[in-house]
Every structure is written in structure tokens, then in C-alpha cells.
């Protein structure tokens, strides 16, 4: 049986990358939330 998680760097970056976050209002809110919190990394890839 094929496993459900088939990792691909491009797919992941396109869906959860910085530019994907910046493209939507809620994504920008998320980045600002992480900035306010003082996160070392804004995006977890």
C-alpha cells in the first residue's frame, strides 16, 4: 500500500512557504503574529 505522505519540496514550499503566506490576508496575519511573538523562524518548512 502506498503511504499517504509523499514529501516534495516544491509542493510544500508552494503551500506553506513565505510567498504563499504573503499572498493571503490570514497568512500575513500569521507572519505578524510570529513576529510579535519573537520567533526565530517565521515559517516552518
UniProtKB/Swiss-Prot annotation:
PROSITE patterns: RIBOSOMAL_L34. It comes from the Bacteria. One of its GO terms (molecular function) is structural constituent of ribosome. Pfam families: Ribosomal_L34. Keywords: Ribonucleoprotein, Ribosomal protein. The keyword Transport does not apply. GO terms for cellular component: ribonucleoprotein complex; ribosome. The keyword Ribosomal protein applies. PANTHER family: LARGE RIBOSOMAL SUBUNIT PROTEIN BL34M, MITOCHONDRIAL RIBOSOMAL PROTEIN 34 FAMILY MEMBER. HAMAP family: Ribosomal_bL34. This is Large ribosomal subunit protein bL34. The lineage of its organism: Bacteria, Pseudomonadati, Chlamydiota, Chlamydiia, Chlamydiales. The gene is rpmH.
